[in-house]
Amino acid sequence: MKTLLLTLVVVTIVCLDLGYTMTCCNQQSSQPKTTTNCAESSCYKKTWSDHRGTRIERGCGCPQVKPGIKLECCHTNECNN
């Protein structure tokens, strides 16, 4: 009985993947794609315009933004590319 219980605990941990991290893109504007592993469960992409043109920032989480900045948050790996 103890063996069965231990087996169920191990299977549960493997299935839940308790150490899971999200993979988000983190390159800026038109730079080559780069990624990072994040503890957060979402990725973001912020877009705005300034004197240099359209700017894009990508990263982990879902931050609050100022008016005039477009924010897209998503919940799958590399969804903010």
Swiss-Prot record:
Tissue expression: Expressed by the venom gland.
Record-linked InterPro entries: Snake_3FTx, Snake_toxin-like_sf, Snake_toxin_con_site, Toxin_cobra-type
**Which residue stretches, if any, does this entry annotate as coiled coil?**
none
User: Per its record, how is this protein called by name?
Assistant: Short neurotoxin 1
| Gene Ontology MF, one | ion channel regulator activity
- Stored Pfam families: Toxin_cobra-type
Q: What's the superkingdom here?
A: Eukaryota
Q: What is its main location?
A: secreted
Query: Record's family?
Result: Belongs to the three-finger toxin family. Short-chain subfamily. Type I alpha-neurotoxin sub-subfamily.
Which N-terminal stretch is annotated as signal sequence? 1-21
Q: What's one GO-annotated cellular component?
A: extracellular region
